[in-house]
Amino acid sequence: MFSMDQDRRKEEERVRSEGRLPPGQALTLKFPVLHYGPVPAFNASTWDFRIWGEVEQEKRWTWDEFNGLPRAKIQMDIHCVTRWSKFDTVWEGVSVRTLADSGLIKIKPSATHVMQHAEYGFTVNLPLEVVLADNFLLATHLNGEPITADHGYPLRGVVGFIPGRELDTPYFWKGAKWLRSLEFMPHDREGFWEQAGYHNR
């Protein structure tokens, strides 16, 4: 236990010296589990993912179809609003920017924000420019393995910090677990926690 704490402190000093640890944050070598409500069951035969709202054509993919979309892999640091940070995490999944650039989805010029809709009606809002940035991913895998059920399997939104890149990086909670759809919107709208009084970041 003492050795693990020493390792954590040493690693924390390293990332702090590199300017990667924001003020008030502490490094964790674990991956804390934080969510509202029970973990939903996943059924691959009934699951689907929907793109809708301010798009030229609504899209709906089955689990097999979603896994056939172009894949991306990104290494990012993640920062939680509860003051822990985890570094050099490698996420794999589908980039919304790639979907747009390839014409698989066509976003209307009127779209300014995106609502992530998850199981149990949970919602998370983000500006469109964040969803289209390199540091946002519709993730299925973490560090080479499928994400676990308590971390959002089969699909979660992930937003993180890419060292050396000047990208808008909201806190990690702005990526929804158990994601089921993206709604492209002509204006911002509060998500679940914003309606409960949380800051819109």
What are these regions (language model features)?
Residues 1-50, 55, 60-63, 102-201:
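Extended, aromatic/histidine-rich regions of cofactor-dependent oxidoreductases associated
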Residues 38, 78-88:
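Second-shell loop/turn segments in exported
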Residues 51, 80, 96:
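Hydrophobic/aromatic pocket-lining and membrane-interface residues
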Residues 58-82:
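Flexible, low-complexity segments enriched for small/polar residues
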Residues 89-93:
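Solvent-exposed, acidic/flexible segments
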